[in-house]
């Protein structure tokens, strides 16, 4: 029941019974009313247009005067103007309502975006603070306290002169298609073969004396220089720009042909056709199709 002693409780009970309408609900309700009125005006206008000829016929039959006909036409025109004016006012009101709704929606979206941006920035700050605190509280490891090593990476363990073992020497017999990479110390690191080859490696173990070690290292460096000088290999292929006949830029296999005493690049179909019909016939450069080559 409604408590009349307390005004706040009375308002609370009334709000429970009669819910408060929001601006959006009121606007949508008014928009529905405007659309109903516009529809009614259009219906009345259509009725006037459809029945005006009946009024004219009735005036001519009953009165037979052009003066009365002029009055009837004036009344119809005034009625139509009134309908137009009412519709124009309703359209303006409808436009105003839609503009206000759009503005309210835009403000709401901007407010939500601002709130989400501030929340994201706050969360990023919290995360960065947690990371900083974690880094500060992290204990030092034993590796961090170890001083850097004074030995260089290129240093080698010292051995007695009489016990020093010479570096091994490797001789490789290869075919022209083999590619051998050697280090500056004379050791063979990589061996890449493009065709089948017989490779024989002989390793000579040197004596333990200093003089023998010196001669072996000199011989190894000389052999490395000789081997690197004798390197031979097929040069890398240069991809042709286009076919001499059909101007094709891509093919599975490039062939050669002689035109005007010069070697020209041909695609696979044009090269096969060239080999079939003769190598020394002139082919016109203006042909674009391989079906009418050498015709």
UniProtKB/Swiss-Prot annotation:
Low complexity composition bias: residue spans: 115-126, 146-163, 181-227
A single BP term in Gene Ontology: regulation of DNA-templated transcription
Matches recorded under PROSITE patterns: GATA_ZN_FINGER_2
Zn finger region (GATA-type): 243-270
Domain of life where this protein originates: Eukaryota
Compositional bias annotation for Basic residues: 164-174
DNA-binding residues: 229-241
InterPro entries the record matches: Znf_GATA, Znf_NHR/GATA
Pfam families according to UniProt: GATA
Keyword set, alphabetical order: DNA-binding, Metal-binding, Zinc, Zinc-finger
Recorded GO MF terms: sequence-specific DNA binding; zinc ion binding
Biased composition range(s): Polar residues: 127-145
Region (Disordered): 115-240
Record flagged with keyword Thylakoid: no
Name the record gives this protein: GATA zinc finger domain-containing protein 23
Organism name: Dictyostelium discoideum (Social amoeba)
